[in-house]
C-alpha cells in the first residue's frame, strides 16, 4: 500500500501530451490509483472551464488546484472549497504594462476566462497557438481590457502573454514592485496571483480540506510554476521533458509527457519502486 494519499499533477507539459490530449494509458494509470484509494488532483494554472473536457474523460479526478493555487475546486460538488484573490487595484497596472509591450492580457475568475476579442486569432504571436481552439470556444471576449479591469474589486489570477521572452522579462521588471506572486510559463507568459499564492499554497488548502498532511502527498510537474509545489510535497517527480533545474530539485525523473511519464510515476508510487 502506498504511503501517499494524494498525487498533485500539473497539466500542460505533464498530464497532457504535446497536442493537449490525454494518453489512454495515462487515463488507465490514474484510474488505478483511484481504485487503490489515492486521490489524483489537477495542479494547474488553468481556469475551471478549461478543465471540463478532461474531467469528462477522468471523472475520478475530483479536485483541482486551479489558477496556479488561487482556487481549489471540487468537481463532484461543483463548488470551490478555497479561493484567494488579488486586489483589483493592481489589475489596471498589469493591463497598462501589457499594452506597453503589445501583449495579451487574460483575466481568470472562478468561472470565467476573459480576453480581448481581436487577440484570440493572433495567439500564435504570443507563443500560445496550441491553446487558440480552446480560447475560441471557452473565453468571454471583450473589446477593451482596461474597461473590463474596472469591473473587478478582486480577481484570482491575471496572465499576460508576451511576444517574446525578452518582452516578458522587461514586463516582469515593470511589475515586480507590486505585491504579487509571479511565475513564468509557456514560451513567454507571465502569471500573476495574490502575494503568497502558489501551487503549493493551493495544495496545502486541499490537504487541509481532505485532512491529510503534505508529507502524504506526491507531486508531478515540469516547469518553473511547479517549483513551489514540488518543493513542498513528500515525493516529487519531474517530467523527462521538464526544465533541467526542475529535474535537479526532484526526488525522481520520469518519462516525457508524450510517453506516459505521469502513468509511469504513478505506477512506481503504487508499487513503491524507484523510477
Give residue ranges: language-model regions.
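Active-site phosphate-binding/coordination module
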Residues: 21-128
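Anion (oxyanion) recognition and catalysis
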Residues: 31-35, 99, 176, 231, ...
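Conserved acidic, metal-coordinating active-site core of Asp-based
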Residues: 89, 97, 101-104, 108-220, ...
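Non-catalytic pre-domain segments flanking phosphatase-related domains
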Residues: 1-11, 28
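Mg2+-dependent phosphoryl-transfer enzymes with acidic/Ser/Thr/Gly-rich catalytic loops
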Residues: 2-6, 17, 23, 190-275
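Hydrophobic packing residues within well-ordered alpha-helices of enzyme cores
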Residues: 51-55, 171, 246, 262
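Short active-site oxyanion
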Residues: 37-41, 61-62, 156-157, 215-216, ...
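Short, structured coil segments at secondary-structure junctions
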Residues: 58-60, 67-68, 76, 176-178, ...
Amino acid at each position: 500500500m502506498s504511503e501517499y494519499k494524494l498525487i498533485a499533477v500539473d497539466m500542460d507539459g505533464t498530464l497532457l501530451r504535446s497536442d493537449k490530449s490525454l494518453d489512454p494509458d495515462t487515463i488507465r494509470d490514474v484510474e488505478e490509483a483511484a481504485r487503490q484509494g489515492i486521490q489524483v488532483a489537477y495542479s494547474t494554472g488553468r481556469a475551471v472551464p478549461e478543465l471540463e473536457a478532461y474531467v469528462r474523460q477522468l471523472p475520478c479526478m475530483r479536485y483541482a488546484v486551479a489558477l496556479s493555487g488561487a482556487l481549489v475546486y471540487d468537481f463532484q460538488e461543483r463548488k470551490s472549497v478555497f479561493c484567494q484573490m488579488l486586489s483589483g487595484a493592481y489589475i489596471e497596472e498589469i493591463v497598462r504594462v501589457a499594452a506597453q509591450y503589445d501583449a495579451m492580457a487574460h483575466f481568470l475568475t472562478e468561472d470565467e476566462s476573459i480576453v480581448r476579442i481581436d487577440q484570440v486569432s493572433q495567439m500564435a504571436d504570443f507563443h500560445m497557438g496550441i491553446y487558440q481552439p480552446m480560447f475560441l470556444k471557452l473565453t468571454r471576449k471583450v473589446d477593451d481590457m482596461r474597461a473590463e479591469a474596472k469591473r473587478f474589486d478582486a480577481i484570482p489570477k491575471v496572465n499576460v502573454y508576451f511576444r517574446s521572452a525578452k518582452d516578458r522579462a522587461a514586463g516582469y521588471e515593470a511589475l515586480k514592485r507590486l505585491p504579487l506572486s509571479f511565475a513564468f510559463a509557456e514560451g513567454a507568459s507571465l502569471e500573476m496571483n495574490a502575494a503568497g499564492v502558489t501551487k503549493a499554497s493551493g495544495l496545502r488548502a486541499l490537504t487541509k480540506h481532505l485532512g491529510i498532511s503534505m508529507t502524504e502527498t506526491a507531486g508531478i510537474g515540469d516547469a518553473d510554476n511547479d517549483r513551489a509545489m514540488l518543493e513542498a510535497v513528500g515525493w516529487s517527480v519531474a517530467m523527462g521533458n521538464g526544465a533541467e533545474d526542475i529535474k535537479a530539485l526532484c526526488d525522481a525523473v520520469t518519462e516525457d509527457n508524450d510517453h506516459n511519464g505521469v502513468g509511469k510515476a504513478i505506477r512506481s508510487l503504487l508499487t513503491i519502486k524507484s523510477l
